[in-house]
C-alpha cells in the first residue's frame, strides 16, 4: 500500500522524498513498479474510483454503509469491509458538524397541549397516515434563518417545508400548507410535533382542525418523542449547512432547497427504508 501511495503522489513530490518519509527503499519501489499488477489491485482501483464518485456526489457526507449501498445499486459486487478499507486508503471521511444556537425569541401563546398519540411509533403502513414536524435554524451573515419541515413517516420524504427570518406560527403553518398542497386533502392523518408555541398557536391548530388532522405532541422536554424529526435535521446540518458559511438568508434558502428537493428526497439513502431514497421507496410502493 505504501508503494501504491508513492506511485499516486510522485507527480506532486519526488519519489525519493516519499520513499524516505514512508521508510521504504527506492529500489524496492521501482522494482514494484515493474511488476505486473494483480487482478485484485486493478479491481481495487476501479472500485475505489466508483467509491470516490459516490462520496463526492453526496457532497462528502456518505459513510461506508451508504456508499456500499450505492455500489450494490450499480451492480458492483463487494463487501462492506472492502468499502471501508478503500475509503480509508483514500482518506474519505464524512465531516462532523459544528453547533451554534440562536436566541429563543419565539412567540409565547397560552394554548391547549395535545397528548402524545404517536408514542414513538415511527413507522407507517401507508403514506399520509403519520406526519412529523419541527423547525431548526441556519446561521447567515444577515442573521438566523429558520427552517420548518414536515416529514411523512411512511417514506421519510420531506413533504412540506418553509423558511423565514422569524420563528413564528406562520413559519410552521406554511410548511403544513405545502404538505397538504403536495399530498392532497388528508384522510385519517396524525400530525406530531413538539409543544412549541408555534404548534400550539390558534393559527396552526385551526389549520389542523379545518382538515380533520389529529394532533399529537411530544412530552415536555423529551426530544426522543420526535426522534425521527431530529434525525432529519441532524442530517441537514451535518451533510450541508454546518459546513458552510452563508452571506445572506437567500443564499441559505437556496442551499436548503437544493438539499431537500435535489438530494435528500430523490437521492439520499435512508437506513430505515432499506437504504433507498424517499422518492425511490415511494416509486417501489407504486406511489410515484
Language model features by range: what are they?
Residues 1-288:
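Charged DNA-binding/catalytic regions of mobile-element recombinases
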Amino acid at each position: 500500500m505504501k508503494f501504491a501511495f508513492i506511485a499516486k503522489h510522485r507527480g506532486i513530490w519526488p519519489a525519493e522524498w516519499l520513499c524516505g518519509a514512508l521508510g521504504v527503499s527506492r529500489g524496492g519501489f521501482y522494482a514494484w513498479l515493474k511488476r505486473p499488477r494483480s487482478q485484485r489491485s486493478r479491481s481495487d482501483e476501479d472500485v475505489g474510483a466508483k467509491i470516490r464518485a459516490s462520496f463526492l456526489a453526496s457532497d462528502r457526507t456518505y459513510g461506508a454503509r451508504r456508499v456500499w449501498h450505492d455500489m450494490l445499486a450499480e451492480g458492483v459486487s463487494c463487501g462492506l469491509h472492502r468499502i471501508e478499507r478503500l475509503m480509508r486508503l483514500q482518506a474519505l471521511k464524512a465531516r462532523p458538524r459544528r453547533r451554534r444556537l440562536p436566541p429563543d425569541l419565539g412567540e409565547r401563546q397560552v394554548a391547549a397541549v395535545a397528548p402524545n398519540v404517536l408514542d414513538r411509533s415511527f413507522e407507517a403502513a401507508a403514506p399520509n397516515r403519520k406526519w412529523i414536524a419541527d423547525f431548526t435554524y441556519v446561521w447567515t451573515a444577515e442573521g438566523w434563518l429558520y427552517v420548518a419541515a414536515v416529514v411523512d413517516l411512511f417514506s421519510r420524504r420531506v413533504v412540506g417545508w418553509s423558511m423565514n427570518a422569524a420563528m413564528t406560527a406562520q413559519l410552521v403553518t406554511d410548511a403544513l400548507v405545502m404538505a397538504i398542497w403536495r399530498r392532497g386533502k388528508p384522510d385519517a392523518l396524525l400530525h406530531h410535533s413538539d409543544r412549541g408555541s408555534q404548534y400550539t398557536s390558534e393559527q396552526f391548530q385551526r389549520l389542523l382542525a379545518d382538515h380533520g388532522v389529529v394532533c399529537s405532541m411530544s412530552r415536555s422536554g423529551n426530544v426522543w418523542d420526535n426522534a425521527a424529526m431530529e434525525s432529519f435535521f441532524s442530517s441537514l446540518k451535518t451533510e450541508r449547512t454546518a459546513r458552510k458559511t452563508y452571506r445572506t438568508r437567500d443564499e441559505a434558502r437556496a442551499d436548503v432547497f437544493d438539499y431537500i428537493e435535489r438530494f435528500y428526497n430523490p437521492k439520499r439513502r435512508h437506513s430505515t427504508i432499506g437504504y433507498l431514497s424517499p422518492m425511490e421507496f415511494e416509486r417501489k410502493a407504486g406511489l410515484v
